[in-house]
């Protein structure tokens, strides 16, 4: 593994953004009834994995994957709230809290 450089973090950020975009496009595809939205979603997922592949060249896989997944989930929840008026119940908020705690624990390990 190469030494960490800021461009590794930039690729991780890009992977998160593309993951969020893919989830939003998937929702907008309405179960692939709008095929172009679905196809764009698949392209965004491929882009997210490609960016993650570049990020793990300088960030440990366990750290990069945990951050990618956690930030992707949290931002997708926020996007669902803002764009689609979706709300979490107390169990959902508890899950988000555990997710954040898990990110801290992995970073401390």
Swiss-Prot record:
It comes from the Bacteria. GO terms for molecular function: amino-acid betaine transmembrane transporter activity; antiporter activity; choline transmembrane transporter activity; spermidine transmembrane transporter activity. It is found in: Cell inner membrane. The chain crosses the membrane at residues 6-26, 36-56, 63-83, 88-108. It holds the Pfam family Multi_Drug_Res. It is a multi-pass membrane protein. InterPro entries: Small_drug/metabolite_transptr, Small_multidrug_res, Spermidine_export_MdtI. The keyword Transport applies. One of its GO terms (biological process) is glycine betaine transport. GO terms for cellular component: plasma membrane. Keywords: Cell inner membrane, Cell membrane, Membrane, Transmembrane, Transmembrane helix, Transport. The keyword Transport applies. Forms a complex with MdtJ. Catalyzes the excretion of spermidine. Belongs to the drug/metabolite transporter (DMT) superfamily. Small multidrug resistance (SMR) (TC 2.A.7.1) family. MdtI subfamily. This is Spermidine export protein MdtI. It comes from Photorhabdus laumondii subsp. laumondii (strain DSM 15139 / CIP 105565 / TT01) (Photorhabdus luminescens subsp. laumondii).
